[in-house]
Design a protein with these regions (language model features):
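Non-catalytic carbohydrate-binding regions of carbohydrate-active enzymes
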Residues: 440-448, 452-453, 462-474, 526-549, ...
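Hydrophobic, well-ordered secondary-structure elements that form the walls
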Residues: 318, 461, 511, 564, ...
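Aromatic-residue-lined binding/catalytic grooves and analogous aromatic/hydrophobic interfacial grooves
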Residues: 1-425, 443-445, 478-479, 516, ...
Length: 694
């Protein structure tokens, strides 16, 4: 069972189901051999259409907002921002629908279901019947194969939570529908939260089967067969982020069926494609029983911490999710990767660019999957194109910028409560995500060593540099960002609680790296001094000595300088970062735990990194409500915020890679790693009791 997720019961909910994907198509398979469900996603299916939701006159209020901040009238500054300087919510990543396979009887005896991370194949077995499912990147199809030692019968249906119809046509079961024009996040409850309209994206899914089947009405019937292959195709009318979604979704969908090979050929091509990526990196950690079901191992890990091979499985799972969720030509992964079953998913399953989107791509280069980084580059190009409108509207500035939330249409404005009917100041008022993503692209370039990519990068950096040249303001004789925040955190100053301030440490650290990267690309950029340790021995979070309101806050934004920054910091700053981390604690959301694994690993402390990995392997009940601490893992090893957010899976994978590359190994680790990547080459070695074996 090495590098496999294994269970002895069908899934009852999303957090127990198994994810499969090819970057564009994502499914969750439940493994119920009486009433099987495959939930379906297509990565371009979003609500909305291209529209400018910047507040064109927001810059008229900028001077008054800055004056209030510098005068420490935080209430006034917040009111101005909420009323006059926000945009609208970004749009939502949507579920396409479900494929349901209702077998004529239940298959339960000797039940098992597995997901092979090396091959990207899910297999469910019981009572002589085997159901195999994978999502082929070469064929761009979902493939299901059912075989049994005696004849079986089943009825297949398609359905969707979106406006849709199901018909049968020429042996194909068709699901056609349209996404809404507007889909508000679930925490917004005022007025109409889902607006259907007629301008939203259209979608189409088609199901076919080989051999003799009956496809009429709203179902496809399989009768007395010992073997059948199902092919499922999906497509949308999405064109690009600038254009109305008017492509022919049905023609696109049907085209994927053209020339589809037989099942053995489809399977062989899929495994060759998938395993070629997965085989680049191996990790063995001694200790643990791979023959046990994964959910059992997860529970046991909390008792004795001895199942180190479960950590290796978690590491490879992050790589697996990258291969399944992000390929060249697809869209960047969202808060849930490409897997979402809800119309109004938590935080709209969109792009949160004050940590989460970036974290999705932290491990990609180091774990040998550099080509899977491409969608983040494409996403950055969207932001650079749209961000000039935001720079002009909010600062009357040149260049481009982007804020904390985006979508497939490349939203760059400060997303939040429209019309000032709520307080969005602790997350929306942050114009630094474009620079952060560019810094991440620069780090990627160190691996790629591609002059053409560097030239593309230089153009995007030049635009963002122009924004900072014309948007920063002087305070106490220094250029500062204002207004700004330390993402989602608050402070107290003179009895006033606020998020809004100027030049928080994260801004300074991002700009320090950004300007150095500009100069490395041949651009003339000023020097921004790095943050310095505070008198209390920690890295300060803000420009002034404010009082913390939440000492163990989930964001560790002020430690950007340690990780994900690729630059080596001074001994003094590293020592201060350790004190900051100790004060922050060892809890938090799932993605927060992953970030702290990366930080402790970068600081060379494998024991504290391991402590956080163990916390991330804390079993979480799928019924757990949304909360901002108490993260862990669901039975299917997907990251629990809770709720599910995929970024934590990538954060912990990046952290484990950092531990192995930097030699920050805990004493209990013995094993072997091969194929990890640095800008200077590959890393492969054996280790025993936390020490490298030459």
């Amino acid at each position: 069972m090495k590098n496999q997720l294994y269970y002895t019961k069908p899934a009852k909910c999303f957090e127990q189901a198994l994810p499969l994907g090819n970057g564009r198509l994502g499914i969750m398979t439940y493994g119920n051999l009486r009433h099987e469900r495959l939930s379906l996603n297509e990565d371009s299916l979003w609500s909305g259409y291209p529209k400018d939701q910047n507040k064109a006159d927001a810059h008229k209020y900028l001077a008054a907002c800055r004056e209030a901040i510098f005068a420490k009238d935080y209430a006034k500054a917040k009111d101005i921002l909420n009323r006059d300087m926000h945009g609208h919510w970004s749009e939502a990543y949507l579920p396409l629908g479900n494929l349901r396979i209702d077998y004529d009887r239940a298959y339960k005896k000797n039940y098992s279901r597995t997901l092979d991370l090396r091959t990207g194949v899910a297999v469910t077995r019981a009572d002589g019947l085997t159901q195999t499912v994978f999502v082929s990147h070469p064929a761009q199809l979902v493939v299901g194969h059912i075989e049994s030692d005696r004849p079986f019968s089943a009825t297949c249906r398609l359905d969707s939570l979106l406006q849709s119809t199901v018909t049968a046509q020429d042996g194909t079961l068709l699901l056609t529908g349209q996404a809404p024009e507007v889909c508000m996040p679930p925490y917004y409850t005022q007025g109409e939260t889902v607006v259907q309209g007629s301008r939203g994206m259209r979608f189409c899914a088609g199901l076919r089967a080989d051999g003799q089947v009956t496809c009429t009405g709203d179902s496809l019937r399989i009768e007395n067969r010992k073997e059948v292959t199902l092919l499922l195709s999906m497509a949308t009318s999405y064109v690009d982020f600038r254009s109305m979604p008017t492509a022919d979704e049905k023609a696109r969908m049907l085209a994927y069926f053209d020339g589809a090979a037989d099942y053995p050929t489809l399977l062989a091509a899929h495994i060759a494609d998938f395993s070629a990526l997965m085989d680049r990196v191996t990790l063995e950690l001694e200790g643990g029983d791979d023959s046990l079901p994964t959910d059992v191992r997860l529970k046991r890990m909390q008792k004795d911490k001895s199942d180190q091979s479960l950590i290796a499985l978690l590491f490879q799972y992050g790589r697996y999710l990258t291969v399944s969720g992000s390929r060249p030509g697809t869209n960047a992964m969202t808060l849930q990767g490409i897997w979402n079953e809800q119309v109004r998913a938590p935080w709209s399953s969109s792009y949160t660019t004050n940590i989460n989107t970036e974290m999705n791509y932290w491990p990609t280069d180091a774990v040998g999957l550099g080509e899977c980084f491409t969608p983040l580059v494409d996403f950055a190009e969207k932001l650079a194109a749209n961000g000039s409108s935001t720079a002009k509207a909010y600062f009357d500035a040149d260049g481009w910028c982007a804020c904390h939330n985006s979508d497939i249409w490349g939203a760059t404005y400060p997303a939040g409560f429209p019309d000032g009917d709520g307080d969005s100041s602790c997350y929306a008022v942050w114009f630094m995500s474009g620079a952060w993503i560019l810094n991440q692209l620069y780090t990627h370039s160190l691996y790629q060593k591609d002059p053409a990519f560097d030239e593309k990068l230089k153009g995007m950096f030049a635009g963002a540099l122009a924004f900072f040249h014309s948007s920063m303001t002087a305070h106490n004789g220094q250029p500062v960002t204002c207004p700004s925040i330390s993402p989602e955190n608050t402070f107290t100053d003179n009895g006033q609680r606020s998020a809004v301030t100027y030049m928080p440490s994260m801004d300074r650290e991002i700009l320090h790296d950004f300007m150095e990267n500009c100069r490395a690309l041949g651009l003339d950029a000023p020097v921004i001094d790095q943050v310095a340790p505070a008198p209390d021995g920690r890295v300060p979070e803000w420009a002034e000595n404010y009082q913390e309101t939440e000492v163990e806050h989930r964001h560790v934004s002020h430690l950007y300088c340690i990780y994900p920054s690729h630059r080596v910091q001074s001994d003094a700053l590293q020592a201060a970062a350790k004190q900051s981390l100790l004060k922050r604690g060892f809890g938090g959301t799932g993605w927060s735990l992953g970030w702290k694994v990366c930080l402790w690993a970068r600081l060379g402390d494998g024991e504290n990194a391991l402590r956080l990995i163990e916390n991330q392997l804390r079993p979480i009940n799928p019924k757990a409500l949304i909360r901002v601490r108490g993260g862990g893992s669901y039975p299917n090893l997907l990251d629990a915020h809770p709720p599910f957010q995929i970024d934590g899976n990538f954060g912990v994978t990046a952290g484990i890679a950092e531990m192995l590359i930097g030699g920050a190994l805990p004493k209990c680790w013995s094993g072997k790693v091969t194929g990890l990547v640095t800008p200077d080459g590959t890393v492969s070695y054996a280790f025993k009791n936390g020490k490298r074996v030459e």
